[in-house]
Amino acid sequence: MPRPPIIIVPPTVYPSPYVYPEQGFTFHGAIAYQRRTGALGYSFDWATQREADVNALDQCGDPQCVVLARFDSGYCGALAVGAQGPFAENGATLDEARTKALMACADPSCEVKVWACTK
């Protein structure tokens, strides 16, 4: 069955995902989530955003997974889930991304389910 199109909610081909910023490259990451099943996936330090998205979706493992967060070199993404649903945010640090996701969720039941940072 074909994978549905990638849906990206704004916040915010190299053989290896590991390339170096000093060489002028940017690292990319993504967080994917499927609300009904709670499946999730994440990726970080990929050479292209497409590679990061595809790897997060593959890790999520459900054909209905969608990318909820994207982040680039030196940034982090975090996904908080509560009664009102999933909330993904980015930040310059892990603490900032987690705090922003929890504040967006704004529910006592919210908890950060996954996070990732790029180099």
What annotation goes with each model-predicted range?
Residues 1-119:
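Helix-coil modules at protein/domain termini and other flexible surface or pore-lining loops
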